[in-house]
Amino acid sequence: MPQKHILVVDDDQNILALIKTILSQKDFRVSTALNGEAAVSLLQKDKFDAIITDAMMPQMDGNALAQSVKNDPKLKDLPIIMVTASKEVDLVKKSFSSGCVLFLPKPFTAASLLSLLQLVLK
């Protein structure tokens, strides 16, 4: 089975490194971006199987990224997992209405991240 390619987007380099390590150990191919704009650029250059994105980032946040993906006919079916430390119900609702399929609250475990990713990749 070919390696699944995951795009991880977060403005915190420590979180990016953590998620990349978790996924790489499970044989995923991982690309990273520090903000939504960089993610959009990567999405235009390469093929991905899923996106894991932080909700709150400067410039283009996770919801704006999700909306951009869902408005692109070539990317609209790409599953998006939103990750955030925020517990605001409005943010969760906005994430789903933007096009995210799952929501992962921080802090999270490697097992919970991998379980959600497996769900969206089926």
Locations of regions flagged by a protein language model:
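Charged docking surfaces used in two-component/phosphorelay signaling
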Residues: A17-Q25
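Receiver (REC) domain active-site loop signature in two-component systems and cognate sites
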Residues: M57
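Acidic, metal-coordinating helix/loop segments flanking the phosphotransfer/catalytic sites
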Residues: T32-A50
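A Lys-centered signature of the CheY-like receiver
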Residues: L104-K106
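C-terminal output helix
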Residues: F108-L117
